[in-house]
């Protein structure tokens, strides 16, 4: 704020406005975009926070149960590839997945129907027999709109925050 001649409150309001202006677009998730807009090294800041990344205690048993049932385990994330790499480095999640896809590779976020068509073409997944789990109702809506039959919301994706509820999808802790 001060380096731009505005108060911290004005800076916060400008960032909030920018944040809302790109909500539900790929830029909302893009570290490069925010680094350029804010003049900060967001990738370095993300790397510094890497040790905070942790898996829920039920994640690996769930993924292994899917594997043992013959199910393909695909992570589709809106996370920027750098952010994803940092999280994987600190969690080892990739060892429990068959495929990892960043929406940045496709050029569309999960909120965009074009992404679902591109991912289906890339992976051959059958929407009628797919379980999709997310913590964002708009994304669950987009998956359901595409035709994914089983959409499930995670009610406590961040143990440091209050539990979430979903208006249009079943939720699971």
Residue ranges and their predicted role:
Residues 77:
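Conserved phosphate-coupling serine/threonine residues in phosphotransfer and NTP-handling enzymes
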Residues 60, 64, 71, 80-81, ...:
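Asp-based, Mg2+/Mn2+-dependent phosphohydrolase catalytic module
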Residues 1-61, 69, 80-82:
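N-terminal helical cap/lid subdomain that shapes the substrate entry/recognition surface
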């Amino acid at each position: 704020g001060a380096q731009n001649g505005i108060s911290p409150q004005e800076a916060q309001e400008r960032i909030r406005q920018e944040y809302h202006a790109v909500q539900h677009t790929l830029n909302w998730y893009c570290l490069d975009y925010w680094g350029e807009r804010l003049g900060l090294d967001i990738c370095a800041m993300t790397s510094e926070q890497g040790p905070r990344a942790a898996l829920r205690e039920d994640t690996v048993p769930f993924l292994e149960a899917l594997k043992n049932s013959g199910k393909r385990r695909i992570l589709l994330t809106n996370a920027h590839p750098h952010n994803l790499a940092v999280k994987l480095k600190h969690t080892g999640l990739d060892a429990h997945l068959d495929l990892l896809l960043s929406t940045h590779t496709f050029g569309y976020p999960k909120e965009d129907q074009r992404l679902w068509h591109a991912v289906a073409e890339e992976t051959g997944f059958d929407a009628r027999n797919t379980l999709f789990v997310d913590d964002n109702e708009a994304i669950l809506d987009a998956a359901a709109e595409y035709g994914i039959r089983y959409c499930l919301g995670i009610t406590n994706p961040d143990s440091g925050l209050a539990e979430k509820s979903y208006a249009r999808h079943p939720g699971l802790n």
